[in-house]
């Protein structure tokens, strides 16, 4: 059930590889050990001119990738740390960005607050 939003900051002349969303979904699904069709990835592109860091300019190789994860329950402690490390590594490899440019955020647990097909996630 994980839903993962990947927001890729791209330069003006950057071309996104065909199939990038599927490659990300496959890699993220393997990271979460999800059965086929159970991890959903939504890929969003953010133009470089719509992203900034205060008092700083970035080289194209430094453009970030923002990742937001929604799961039934959020892991804790070492399990969360390990999952973030694996997820950042997988996304870095697929996008060609350094792992230091991949930033992962976990949303609050979906249990009890999200519905699929009219059914509350328990």
Language-model-detected regions and their locations in the chain:
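Interaction-mediating elements
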Residues: 1-122
């Amino acid at each position: 059930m994980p839903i993962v939003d990947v927001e890729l900051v791209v330069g003006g002349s950057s071309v996104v590889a065909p199939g990038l969303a599927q490659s990300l979904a496959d890699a993220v699904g393997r990271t979460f050990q999800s059965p086929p069709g159970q991890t959903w990835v939504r890929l969003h592109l953010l133009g470089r001119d719509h992203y900034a860091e205060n008092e700083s300019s970035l080289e194209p190789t430094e453009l970030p990738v923002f990742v937001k994860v929604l799961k039934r329950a959020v892991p804790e402690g070492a399990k969360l740390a390990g999952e973030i490390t694996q997820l950042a590594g997988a996304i870095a490899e697929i996008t060609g960005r350094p792992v230091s440019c991949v930033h992962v955020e976990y949303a609050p647990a979906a249990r009890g607050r999200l519905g699929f097909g009219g059914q509350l996630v328990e």
